[in-house]
A protein has these predicted regions:
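Extended, low-polarity segments enriched in aliphatic/aromatic residues
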Residues: 1-194
């Protein structure tokens, strides 16, 4: 039976929360993190860093939505750079991001603009209105997240018109600050903003 750790093992550097993780994650020698290539209504992009939410015992609303780019409890946008991003703490956690040996992003059928709906065909070359047919693998989480972000930004550019089954937010990956967490995770001079 999987159960929560005995004490809080993830601590958010803005001092807002700390939380438990599941015991199997705490005891793991290493983690292989598998995510899908897709956008997300609140985080705007959702890859391996956000995938670690499943390792934390509390609901995601309490943990992360307050630092997402598009949605906060007070309804305000949290756009721009050098803002607190909880994903940086997750990427830097010794139990989560630092214990991840391999990051995999499944883009065989790339996601549409709404994470709750099905995949759509991609327009950018070499796909040319076909499925993405891609897998991304890296030991470097910042690198794989950056490549996936570039991929999504190229496809979901506000010009391409995707299938109406999932095109609600055509321009999600092109918002000011969407890659702020990647800049922070890659740059130690910004560590005071998010300090895992």
């Amino acid at each position: 039976v999987v159960k929560p750790s005995e004490t809080d093992l993830i601590h958010f550097s803005d001092k807002s929360y700390s939380d438990r993780i599941y015991d199997v994650v705490e005891q793991a020698d290493y983690i292989i993190n598998v995510a899908n290539l897709r956008t997300h209504g609140a985080a705007l992009i959702s890859f391996t860093a956000k995938g670690h939410l499943g390792s934390i015992t509390s609901e995601t609303e309490r943990l992360l939505h307050y630092s997402h780019l598009a949605k906060r409890k007070d309804g305000a946008a949290y756009e721009g750079y050098k803002k607190y991003r909880a994903l940086v703490d997750i990427m830097g956690s010794r139990y989560l991001g630092q214990n991840t040996m391999l990051n995999i992003v499944d883009a065989l059928f790339g996601g549409g603009s709404d994470e709750t709906k099905g995949p759509v065909k991609y327009f950018m070359p070499p796909f040319n209105n076909d499925w993405c047919n891609s897998l991304f693998l890296s030991q470097d989480q910042v690198a794989i997240e950056s490549v996936c972000y570039d991929f999504m930004r190229s496809e979901w550019n506000g010009v391409n018109k995707h299938s109406p089954i999932n095109n609600r937010w055509e321009i999600l990956p092109d918002r000011d600050g969407i890659d702020d967490y990647l800049h922070q995770a890659a740059d130690l001079s910004l560590i005071h903003i998010s300090d895992p």
